[in-house]
């Protein structure tokens, strides 16, 4: 009976305030942009991450159209790519192809260099945006990993290695959960509920994101309003309101309103509100090319925007989801992880992923000053996010989708 890797994935998105506007370009960002132009490695993998994100989203959406969806394609892809360093044969090929990489078109070294640059960029200090990522290897104290695997995951993926006593399952579980809780500043606790008895290695990835909107909503304008979960279900939610000029337009191809909201710093959220009865059309039609055009070509419209406060999370056992994308061998007795250790055959027994999304008016660290809205002589057009919508959050410098989700019920954790 082979030993197993219990592989845990984690991320947090704490999106704490909402507001329109263009990004502030300070000296820090200008320098960051120069670095990215000199080292565009992460740009080369960005289109593949975007395709992987939509593929994964569609698998999750097919599983249920009545629940919230929220996950980080960057977090999941990073952990998979890191694991691929220790795989061989079909196990290796399935992982990289499942991430939308074609090894005849992109050298494997370029893929890992892209992730290396991505992680360096995400962890770059920023006074306006909190964005950090971490990778942890929890290794059975009696398990000897191959030196090359350890060197590669440390140099390319900035992974930390922790000796772990997996003979004491509760102690090991607490060690992993403490690492996760600290990395996400207490937002995600108890990621790992239990470990399999033959676990000898755990791979953990987390992303912590906390952003402030450039022009937050005025809390005084928030009112309890109806949100239509489906034709038969309505819930009351705190509905924020702001009048002004927004990066907003109606896309006839998607039959949806497209709203772009910039964070202070280097991230943007795209919200897609389908017309009545058009959610399935939106999910079937949206593509990476369309989303890329939205980011490049913005349209500004004067509206009165109504947007719900959101607090949702997504928790996923990824084995079934990844299998739908062709990543199967790594979870089977046919797995080849001989690049990790030569001591015993390994399989991945568990792949866990959790994400949390919070959106409100001011943000958890908003300054005391109140930013007023623009007042118009005549009432502008109203756009009301009072039914299910999609969200994609991008990091500008790497052009990568950090988070993807669907808000079906803003009050459902």
From Swiss-Prot:
Can you say what this protein is called?
A: Alpha-1-antitrypsin-like protein CM55-MS
Q: Where is this region: RCL?
A: 368-387
Cited SUPFAM superfamilies? Serpins (SSF56574)
Keyword Methyltransferase present in the record's keywords: the answer is no
Protein's cellular compartments: Secreted
Query: Which Gene Ontology CC terms are recorded?
Result: extracellular space
Molecular-function GO terms, alphabetical: serine-type endopeptidase inhibitor activity
Listed A to Z, the keywords are:
Glycoprotein, Protease inhibitor, Pyrrolidone carboxylic acid, Secreted, Serine protease inhibitor, Signal
Domain comment in the entry: The reactive center loop (RCL) extends out from the body of the protein and directs binding to the target protease. The protease cleaves the serpin at the reactive site within the RCL, establishing a covalent linkage between the serpin reactive site and the active site of the protease. The resulting inactive serpin-protease complex is highly stable.
InterPro entries to which the protein is assigned, alphabetical: Serpin_CS, Serpin_dom, Serpin_fam, Serpin_sf, Serpin_sf_1, Serpin_sf_2
Q: Which purpose does this protein serve, as stated in its record?
A: Serine protease inhibitor.
Q: Where is the signal peptide?
A: 1-24
* SMART domains from the UniProt entry: SERPIN
Where is it mostly found?
A: secreted
Tissue expression profile of the protein: Expressed in liver.
Glycosylation sites recorded in the entry for this protein: 65, 102, 165, 266
- Say which family it is in: Belongs to the serpin family.
A Pfam family this chain is assigned to: Serpin
PANTHER family in the cross-refs: ALPHA-1-ANTITRYPSIN (PTHR11461:SF165), SERINE PROTEASE INHIBITOR, SERPIN (PTHR11461)
């Amino acid at each position: 009976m082979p030993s197993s890797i219990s592989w845990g994935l984690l991320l947090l998105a704490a999106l704490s305030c909402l507001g329109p506007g263009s990004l502030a370009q300070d000296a820090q960002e200008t320098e960051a942009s120069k670095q990215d132009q000199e080292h565009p490695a992460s740009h080369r993998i960005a289109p593949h991450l975007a395709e992987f994100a939509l593929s994964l989203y569609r698998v999750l959406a097919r599983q249920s159209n009545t629940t919230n969806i929220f996950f980080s394609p960057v977090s999941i892809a990073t952990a998979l790519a890191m694991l691929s360093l220790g795989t061989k044969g079909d196990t290796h090929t399935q992982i990289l192809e499942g991430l939308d990489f074609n090894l005849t078109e992109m050298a494997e070294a370029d893929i890992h260099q892209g992730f290396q640059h991505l992680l360096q960029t995400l962890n770059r200090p920023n006074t306006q945006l909190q964005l950090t990522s971490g990778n942890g290897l929890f290794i059975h104290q009696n398990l000897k990993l191959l030196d090359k695997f350890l060197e590669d995951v440390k140099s390319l993926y900035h992974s930390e290695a922790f000796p772990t006593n997996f003979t004491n399952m509760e102690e090991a579980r607490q060690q992993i959960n403490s690492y996760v809780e600290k990395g996400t500043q207490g937002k995600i606790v108890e990621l790992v509920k239990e470990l399999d008895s033959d676990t000898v290695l755990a791979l953990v990835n987390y992303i912590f994101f906390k952003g402030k909107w450039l022009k937050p909503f005025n809390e005084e304008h928030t009112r309890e309003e109806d949100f239509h979960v489906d034709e038969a279900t309505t819930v009351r939610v705190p509905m924020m309101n702001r009048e002004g000029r927004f990066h907003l337009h109606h896309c006839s191809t998607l039959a949806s309103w497209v709203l772009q909201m910039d964070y202070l710093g280097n991230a943007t959220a795209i919200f897609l509100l389908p017309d009545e009865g058009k959610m399935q059309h939106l999910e079937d039609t949206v593509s990476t090319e369309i989303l890329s055009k939205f980011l490049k070509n913005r349209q500004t419209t004067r509206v009165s925007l109504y947007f719900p406060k959101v607090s949702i999370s997504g928790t996923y056992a990824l084995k079934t989801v990844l299998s739908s994308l062709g990543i199967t061998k790594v979870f089977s007795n046919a797995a080849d992880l001989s690049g990790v250790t030569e001591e015993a055959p390994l399989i991945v027994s568990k792949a866990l992923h959790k994400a949390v999304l919070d959106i409100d008016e001011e943000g958890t660290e908003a300054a005391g000053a109140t930013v007023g809205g623009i007042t118009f002589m005549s009432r502008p057009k109203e756009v009301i996010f009072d039914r299910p919508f999609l969200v994609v959050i991008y990091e500008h410098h790497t052009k990568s989708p950090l988070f993807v989700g669907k808000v079906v019920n803003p009050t459902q954790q």
